Amino acid sequence: MPTIALYNMNREKIGEVALDEQIFAAEVKEPLIHQALKVQLANRRAGTVKTKTRAEVSGGGKKPFKQKGTGNARQGCSRAPQYPGGGTVFGPQPKTYNLGINKKARKAALRSLLSMQLKSEKITVLDQIEFAKISTKDFAGFMKKFDLERSLIITEEPSTNLALSSRNVPYVKLLKADGLNVFDVLKYQNIVMTEGAVRLVEGALQ
């Protein structure tokens, strides 16, 4: 069974946490990670891009000039694609990019990622992350004490002080344990978790 050091906010080791080997020592399945990331990014797309065809552009009901006698090529509508302000030919239309993934596969992808991060020593576990007051300076000092830069902080339920202290610090994201996802785990170099969040994640990924 894998274990990891447990720290307090002063970076003092106060014990060890036993981790579920099914979650943190799982077989790494890169194709599943790729699939889960692809699905998550696709589902974020709004798909609302839209251009108007010649039938949808307002105006242009009148023939620009008579059919014959001007020397110009015949035209029937000033909103045709060759005119400035005319409609677009084969332009993008609204569509859904949504993809699906089985719950079992999504959980396996997260287990693979957490196992990779633990093996790379990118996970830090604390007994709690709590601040007595709202202070970006205190939070930045805490991050510096642990030599953390691009970090994903996962807690059971972020306190108001923690949320407000961290929100103005670049390259840091605060996340509830039940919101753990493939994109954020890949995006951030380090994962900081409370002991309670570890247990919630283990329960969710069984």
Swiss-Prot record:
GO biological process, one term: translation
Keywords: Ribonucleoprotein, Ribosomal protein, RNA-binding, rRNA-binding
GO terms for cellular component: ribonucleoprotein complex; ribosome
InterPro entries (alphabetical): Ribosomal_uL4, Ribosomal_uL4-like, Ribosomal_uL4_dom_sf
Pfam family, one: Ribosomal_L4
Subunit note: Part of the 50S ribosomal subunit.
Family per similarity comment: Belongs to the universal ribosomal protein uL4 family.
Name the UniProt record assigns to this protein: Large ribosomal subunit protein uL4
Species assigned in the record: Trichlorobacter lovleyi (strain ATCC BAA-1151 / DSM 17278 / SZ) (Geobacter lovleyi)
